């Protein structure tokens, strides 16, 4: 079972600031069981966290979860973001394929989930398949990715599709987009 860890709390721990109650718009994402934070960086434009299985590193991984918050990127829809990423991916990896998994509104936010597959990554010589979930917030754009350097089984795909389904954005300023209460 995944335990809920809010990205805001993960960032607070990584950057040495005290954890506090959720405020304003927040990305709600879980720390996968058996994973660790392998890399985290915050700039004025972005917060990025990369998580890998405990036995792997961000330099040598077979599976990775990446969480990104693009601060103040408000006017880009998930489909526009997807189109940008697909163009970059296709240029970097000939023969890439793309598939929209779902698109809609979750907690009143536009969202889209899609996959991108590179048959052979030029840098690693291995295939790479990445699931993406993008959420257009009022304050920022949120992106969560699950990447594999192998072809996942149907069971693995189901587990991680469910993981992405649980990724949400909430806003303490809006009664129609409530954040979870502290326990």
Where on the chain are the PLM-derived regions?
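Signature of long, low-cysteine stretches enriched in small and polar/charged residues
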Residues: 88-133
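Bacterial N-terminal signal peptides
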Residues: 5-14
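Sec/Tat signal peptide C-region and signal peptidase I cleavage site
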Residues: 15-21
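Surface-exposed amphipathic alpha-helical segments
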Residues: 139-183
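Secretory pathway targeting signatures of secreted, lumenal, and periplasmic proteins
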Residues: 34-74
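A short, surface-exposed beta-strand/turn
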Residues: 126-141, 147
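Mid-chain, structured segments of secreted extracytoplasmic proteins
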Residues: 63-106
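Short N-terminal segments immediately surrounding and downstream of signal-peptide cleavage
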Residues: 21-40
């Amino acid at each position: 079972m995944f335990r809920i860890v809010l990205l805001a709390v993960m960032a607070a721990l990584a950057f040495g600031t005290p954890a506090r109650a959720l405020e304003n718009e927040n990305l709600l994402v879980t720390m996968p069981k058996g994973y660790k934070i392998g890399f985290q960086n915050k700039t004025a434009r972005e917060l990025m966290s990369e998580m890998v299985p405990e036995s792997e590193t961000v330099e040598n991984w077979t599976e990775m979860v990446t969480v990104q918050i693009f601060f103040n990127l408000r006017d880009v829809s998930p489909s526009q973001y997807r189109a940008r990423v697909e163009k970059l991916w296709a240029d970097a990896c000939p023969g890439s394929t793309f598939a929209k998994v779902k698109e809609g509104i979750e907690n009143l936010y536009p969202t889209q989930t899609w996959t991108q597959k590179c048959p052979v990554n030029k840098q690693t010589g291995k295939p790479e398949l990445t699931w993406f979930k993008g959420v257009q917030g009022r304050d920022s754009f949120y992106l969560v990715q699950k990447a594999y350097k192998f072809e996942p089984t149907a069971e693995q795909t189901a587990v991680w599709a469910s993981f992405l389904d649980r990724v949400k954005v909430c806003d303490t300023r809006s009664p129609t987009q409530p954040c979870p209460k502290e326990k």
